[in-house]
Regions:
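WD40-repeat beta-propeller superdomains and closely related acidic/aromatic-rich repeat-like regions
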Residues: 1-341
């Protein structure tokens, strides 16, 4: 249900994949919207709207991830066939296949400057350099790799598994540091300034490590009604937005950090928050939920949403265009829709 107190806008355009959307993304030049369905199909749409440009079956048994390089004309997908695949986001042409191993390729992440692609299958991850073709393979983790996150300059990679977070040197593929936690982690993010590594835990909390890490100084923010799978950083690294329920909690990580502080609570969704995304160089936060609504917020200034967009079904993914002027969202019923900030 939409919120009658918040200005309601209609999407600029919308289409439907025919099955639930796993993830949405934008090409590096902002001209193409990419949507990947859980059935393995990928669709390419003109960002300005109009007929489907190209559609193809990317993974025979299902798709987990669908993400464009932030700097190059490359689309990466990950699926249940044990492969990560590289595509041309304009034509849909298959450019390269990368073997993940014997397991599903569940996690995939581009370095912010596009120099490396990380993807994981089972207990290992691999790093691929699009320019040189170099591939690094990690040692086995304690369990399945649950999440991957790059440092903003692309020099380091964080990987989450049972027992904590591992930090790695990207160029050499070397293990650097272990950030301990007692159980499994369900999400992972690195602040743009590299100061904080954050993860959602099985215990309905957010765990934070400040770098350089000193044992005993890790923080835990609890009180969430569900596991926190949604994490988004403001580009300044000051604000961390978290899901884990119908409310969005925004933590101020400036100065000494969030220890002992009270988060700003954003209320508006009538169901669980399922997607969060900040503009890459702006102040707007987009949120989507099981209530089929997308809200836009200026979370640093107000606890009230600026505007809302009503979609046909629960939101599964939200992503901002490279210039921050538009967003695209995917829904559980297959809807793909774009809106303006």
């Amino acid at each position: 249900m939409s919120n009658p107190l918040v200005p309601l806008r209609s999407p600029d355009w919308q289409a439907n994949l025919g099955d639930a959307v796993a993830e949405v993304s934008w090409s590096a030049d902002g001209s193409t919207v990419v949507a990947g369905g859980v059935d393995g199909r990928v669709a390419l749409f003109p960002a300005a709207g109009g007929p489907l440009r190209q559609g193809f079956n990317a993974h025979a048994h299902g798709l987990f991830r669908c993400r464009c390089s932030p700097t190059e004309p490359l689309l990466a997908t990950a699926g249940q066939d044990g492969l990560a695949k590289l595509w041309d986001p304009q034509s849909g042409a298959l450019l390269k296949e990368l073997a993940g191993g014997s397991a599903w390729v569940e996690q995939l992440s581009w370095a912010p400057r596009g120099k490396w692609l990380a993807f994981s299958a089972g207990k290992k991850f691999r790093l691929w350099n699009p320019t040189t073709g170099v591939v690094h393979e990690s040692a086995d983790h304690r369990s399945t790799v649950g999440a991957l996150a790059f440092l903003a300059d692309g020099s380091r990679l964080a990987s989450a598994c049972y027992g904590g977070v591992e930090l790695w040197d990207v160029e050499g593929g070397r293990h650097l540091e272990h950030l301990p936690w007692k159980t499994s982690l369900v999400s992972l993010s690195w602040s743009p300034d590299g100061r904080w590594v954050v993860a959602g835990t099985q215990e309905l909390a957010v765990q934070i490590w400040e770098l350089p890490f000193r044992p005993g100084e890790e923080l835990a923010m609890s009180g969430y009604p569900a596991k926190v799978r949604e994490l988004a950083w403001h580009y300044s690294s000051r604000y961390l937005a978290t899901g884990g329920g119908p409310e969005i909690m925004v933590w101020d990580c400036n100065g000494k950090g969030p220890a002992g502080s009270t988060p700003r609570i954003l209320q508006g969704h009538g169901g669980k928050v399922t997607a969060l995304s900040y503009q890459s160089a702006g102040h707007l936060l987009a949120s989507g939920g099981t209530d089929a609504c997308v809200f836009l917020w200026n979370a640093g200034k107000s606890s009230s949403p600026l505007r809302q967009f009503k979609l046909p079904a629960a939101i599964t993914s939200v992503a901002w265009s490279p210039d921050g002027s538009r967003f695209v969202t995917g829904c559980r019923d297959g809807t793909v829709a774009a809106g303006s900030a």
